[in-house]
Amino acid sequence: LYDIDPQRLEESHLMLTALNNNLGNKARIETYCGVENRRAALRGANYAVNAIQVGFYDPCTITDFEVPKKYGLRQTIADTLGIGGIFRALRTIPVMMDFARDMEDVCPDAWFLNYTNPMAMLTGAMQRYTGIKTVGLCHSVQVCAESLLKTVGMPYEEDNVRAKIAGINHMAWLLEITDRNGNDLYPEIKRRAAQLTEKHDNMVRLEIMKRFGYYVTESSEHNAEYLPFFIKDKYPELIDRFNIPLDEYPRRCVQQIADWEKRRDELTRNPSLA
């Protein structure tokens, strides 16, 4: 485990230690704090999992929203592309390059698994300008089929659903969705989607599925920014029609920070954590 924040590092260590204890103590967990110890943390690694945020929510994420808004540019998430994504990339790419330089020296054959946004910009920078093998990942792939089925009122059982997903980092397509017997679920999904009348959180994604034939992995908030069809200053009625939550990410961050502070002690002191 590596972090530049000793408190966050200790919290992560406590939780992983509890998990390890409850799963048979099969892992050896070591911690490294501070930039001066980064090379030691990476030395000999086969994989490096990256999940960082440069600049924190306050002030940087706030700035990513407030500056564009001042000039009439509205956003929902602002962590992948557009003005907010560019801001985030400009402050994060230099840190990623530092990671890469260290990895080239102490673990040149390791895979860099990136969970940090802006996904495409950061992964692209690593692939173009470093010698480190890099893959961009997002948890949306794991929950894609479940979110679609629940949106249209169909049951989701992990053991009964098969999904084939492909695409670029942070923007992939659900190419196939079947039950365990190979029956295509898309026809029934699309039939039910066409009958929905109440507003819901997946309206942008269902509109994309209607137009292109396939469901996308990323949320409606993300896709409202990815495509130039939804957030239009000349057509503000689209915001309401597709239930697009402008300024969603700052609200989400505030709630997540509050939830984390509330749950932190419970998690780190829970002897049955697994």
Residue ranges and their predicted role:
Residues L1-I62, I77-A78, G85-Y156, N169-L174, ...:
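Metallocofactor- and cofactor-centric catalytic cores in central/energy metabolism, strongly enriched
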Residues G34, G72, G82-G85, I165-G167, ...:
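Glycine-centered flexibility motif
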Residues E66-G82:
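A solvent-exposed, charged loop/short amphipathic helix patch at secondary-structure junctions
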Residues G153-A274:
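Long, compositionally biased stretches enriched for glycine and/or charged residues
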